[in-house]
């Protein structure tokens, strides 16, 4: 069970920050990452791994707070926010806070190195919300927010390029747990990416809903 005071603080002071992010990284996203992080942490505890669920919860809650300063270095900013938030010292030791900051820094899928700690692997895995329709939707949302001058065909080309670079065979996304449900989901997503006959109608429907 998460510390009630920590949860109240996060819900009051941290989660509202996501309401100002782009549509692909708002409150629904962070709540999903929190839920998946806790599910992974609890599964590991059942396997006998020593995991602090409060740490896993807080890391997930803070992992994208750095988007307030843009996307390119948001993982670094998120780590800084954790280190500078004096309220976290009510619940965590300096050593725990440093582990949490490192985990937030390491969560980004496009980072060139593996997460340094188990907590980094947890939030990185939880951040891979591999539900094919959700992935395509979030990709379109990001494109509409950040490239508003593109027309429909250009958005489709950008979507396909991003999906291939991140999720395709040889893409930069990595999964950190062999028994992760994301493994089967990634296989289904790759099948979708490889099939324009399936991907294009899905794109057209979602684009019309979001435009």
Placement of each model-derived feature along the sequence:
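Short alpha-helical hairpin
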Residues: 1-16
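Short amphipathic alpha-helical segments
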Residues: 8-12, 27-35, 54, 59
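Divalent metal-dependent phosphate-bond-processing catalytic cores, especially two-metal-ion Mg2+/Mn2+ enzymes
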Residues: 19-49, 62, 111-211
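Active-site metal-coordination segments of metallo-dependent hydrolases
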Residues: 21-32, 66-77, 94
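An active-site-proximal "capping" alpha-helix that borders the catalytic cofactor pocket
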Residues: 33-38, 73-88
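His-Asp-centered metal-binding catalytic motifs of divalent-metal-dependent phosphohydrolases/nucleases
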Residues: 51-70, 74, 78, 99-109
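Hydrophobic, well-structured mid-protein blocks that either form specific transmembrane helices
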Residues: 79-116
